[in-house]
Swiss-Prot record:
Single biological process term from Gene Ontology: venom-mediated fibrinolysis
GO MF, one example: nucleotide binding
Residues involved in a divalent metal cation 2 binding: 43, 94, 126, 229, 253
Glycosylation sites: 108, 287, 326, 387, 552, 555
Biological role: Cleaves adenosine triphosphate (ATP) and adenosine diphosphate (ADP) to adenosine monophosphate (AMP) and inorganic phosphate. Enhances fibrin degradation in the midgut blood bolus. Activates human tissue plasminogen activator (PLAT), probably via an allosteric activation mechanism. Inhibits ADP-mediated host platelet aggregation in vitro and in mosquito midgut. Inhibits host neutrophil activation in the mosquito midgut: reduces neutrophil extracellular traps formation in the presence of platelets and the formation of total cell- and mitochondrial-derived reactive oxygen species.
Additional remarks: Protein is mixed with the host blood and ingested by mosquito during blood feeding. A reduction in both Plasmodium berghei oocyst intensity and infection prevalence is observed in mosquitoes that feed on mice immunized with the protein prior to infection with P.berghei parasites. Immunization of mice with the protein reduces P.berghei sporozoite infectivity in the mouse skin after mosquito bite.
Binding site for AMP: 367, 402, 507
Top-level division of the source organism's lineage: Eukaryota
Family, similarity comment: Belongs to the 5'-nucleotidase family.
Protein name: Apyrase
Cellular component GO terms, alphabetical: extracellular space; plasma membrane
InterPro entries for this protein: 5'-Nucleotdase_C (IPR008334), 5'-Nucleotdase_C_sf (IPR036907), 5'-Nucleotdase_CS (IPR006146), 5_nucleotidase/apyrase (IPR006179), Calcineurin-like_PHP_ApaH (IPR004843), Metallo-depent_PP-like (IPR029052)
EC number: 3.6.1.5
Length: 570
């Protein structure tokens, strides 16, 4: 592919009178451009095994794509092919969460395969906190054994005990060829508001990157790469506001495919949408150029960008594209062998039958309506704490569910994939006023214009979506064991069971942090598995009573179907 050049197409020669700092990074008098090849992946999300085009389990071997064996074969090939152009392999985070491999084997399998081909640097994604800092710490410890550096400039531990011994740097300086290359990490600023980060918080990523870049400049580092898990929009903003100090942003989080539309290279035309050129180019007022890359997600692509720098660290030209991991891409034989015992363990654990369901446990409707999967999980939550003296209500937000469960056998794997996010099931004492407020909040639109409709047990809710936000709940009744209903009293204290994610006030449910006497319970998937085992059959009779009635729905209609998706969009 022809080199893309900006400004006038000439060879830029550095001044002989180079500043002392620049001279240390680039030998005095050197005229040739310095090539740096960035090989990058992001948002793997536990796709260790090959997948279909939709990044789900592949059942037809002739159509399988992606998988860590293809990804690693390609990275090794690129490192060899571009060995004279100073290759760096970067991982932009979110290696956790997304398949049964992670749900059953967690950090163990993730660390194992990351260590199989160590990146030169990596950052953390928000999903690395899905099982709290306690679930992250052993993963980092394993990577540190292989001296794999983890960089996040805007992460503050704040004394988080689980990460006390973890080495998370703000940046790292790598000696590449005869130059110094600084790699700064950045993570989505609001991660601590949407993930289980414990005491860890994330500061403003732009301010943190600027500050760290200034420190690197003082150390005579004039090529700076930002390894970002902030999303494409965040990366564009970063380039605008900190671009005078940085050169390339290797991105993640938004699962964006960047590719020049006129590039004659393969990509998934059926399921992937091109969101911009590879790379996106941001030109600063001082003629400084910043390049932004990203390589979709789920191991479907490996990005490769070769950038030529002059002796002052200015981008001169670039060339590259994301390589599609289609079925024709070879798989690394050694990695395939390493996958076999892990695959067998996932299959053994995942296929164990724990019960059956007579109804379709619908997940797609949960954002907009009462859904059968939500009913089941809320019932499991309430049952966890129900005894002769306590009969709690339960409330689960719609975003807590991932996969539906079809009629028939329910396996360990299906249950875990339905509720994979690793919240503990906690009980709090909460005022009726705060419970009302929390359920009302579930009928407000989030940043992606979705509701987070409350899925409840032991309650009957009526909401009118034609009303103003936070005035939409019209009534809440507490439903006793015998089915008797009594109106919720705002001045009364109730036992309420919620996921720890909500008890921590995430997703805007700050009112739930007012809960007292908090009891921390087992993982949500474990609670669901035990409840299904206890009942054995998830019968239609469990879903006869309407729990959440929504009036004047603005986006569609809600049915009470037990055999198919309940929500029908307009």
């Amino acid at each position: 592919m022809a080199l893309v050049r900006f400004a006038t197409i000439i060879t830029v020669l550095c001044h002989l009178a180079i500043q002392d700092g620049a001279a240390k990074s680039f030998p005095h008098g050197e005229k040739a451009p310095f090539p740096l090849t960035l090989i990058h992946i992001n948002d793997l999300h536990a796709r260790f095994d090959e997948t279909n085009q939709k990044s789900s389990t592949c059942t037809n071997s002739k159509e399988c794509i992606a998988g860590i064996a293809r990804v690693y074969h390609t990275i090794k090939q690129l490192k060899s092919e571009y060995k004279t152009k100073n290759p760096l392999y970067l991982n932009a985070g979110d290696n956790f969460q997304g398949t049964l491999w992670y749900n059953l084997l967690r950090w163990n399998v993730t660390a194992y395969f990351i260590k199989e081909l160590p990146p030169d640097a990596m950052t953390l994604g928000n999903h690395e906190f899905d099982h709290s800092p306690k679930g992250l710490a052993p993963y980092l410890a394993e990577l540190e054994k292989m001296k794999i550096p983890t960089v996040v400039a805007n992460l503050e531990k704040n004394g988080e005990p689980a990460l006390k011994d973890s080495k998370i740097a703000r940046s790292i300086v790598l000696k590449v060829g005869n130059r110094k290359v600084g790699v700064i990490g950045a993570l989505y600023d609001k991660t601590h508001l949407v993930a289980q980060t414990g005491m860890v918080t994330l500061t403003n990523s732009i301010e943190a990157v600027r500050k760290e870049a200034q420190e690197l400049k003082k150390k005579n580092v004039n090529i700076i790469v930002v390894l970002s898990h902030c999303g494409l929009d965040g990366d564009k903003q970063l380039a605008e506001e900190a671009g005078d100090l940085i050169d390339v942003i290797v991105g993640a989080h938004s699962h964006s495919l960047l590719l020049n539309k006129d590039a004659k290279v393969p990509y998934d035309t059926k399921y992937d949408t091109i969101e911009g050129d590879y790379p996106l180019v941001v030109k600063k007022s001082n003629n400084h150029t910043v390049l932004i890359t990203q390589a979709r997600s789920f191991g479907k692509y490996v990005g490769r960008l070769t950038v030529n720098f002059d002796c002052e660290g200015e981008v001169q030209s670039w060339e590259g594209y994301p390589i599609y991991m289609n079925n024709s891409v070879k798989q690394d034989e050694e990695v395939l062998r390493e996958l076999e015992p892990w695959r067998a363990e996932v299959k053994r654990l995942g296929t164990q039958v724990i019960g059956t369901t007579e109804v379709f446990l619908d997940r797609e409707s949960c954002r907009w309506c009462e859904c059968t999967l939500g009913d089941l999980i809320a019932d499991a939550y309430a049952d966890q704490y129900t005894n002769s003296t306590v009969q709690p209500v339960a409330f689960v937000q719609a975003g807590n569910f991932r996969n539906p469960i079809e009629k028939g056998d329910i396996t360990n794997g299906l249950a875990i994939e339905a509720a994979p996010y690793g919240s503990s099931v906690d009980m709090i004492k909460l005022s009726g006023a705060d419970l009302w407020s929390a359920i009302d909040h579930s009928f407000t639109l989030d940043d992606e214009f979705r509701y987070n409709t409350a899925q409840v047990s032991g309650m009957a809710v009526v909401a009118d979506l034609s009303k103003k936000p936070y005035e939409r709940v019209q009534s809440i009744d507490i439903v006793g064991a015998n089915g008797a209903k009594t109106a919720l009293k705002k001045d009364q204290i109730y036992y309420v069971v919620v996921p720890s994610y909500l008890a921590d006030g995430k997703d805007g449910f700050a009112m739930l942090k007012k809960g007292t006497n908090r009891v921390t319970g087992p993982l949500d998937s474990d609670v669901l598995i035990e409840y299904v085992r206890k009942r054995q059959t998830i019968a239609k009779t469990m879903f006869q009573e309407k729990r959440v009635v929504i009036e004047n729905h603005t986006n569609g209609t809600c049915s009470w179907d037990l055999d198919s998706q309940r929500y029908k969009p307009k």
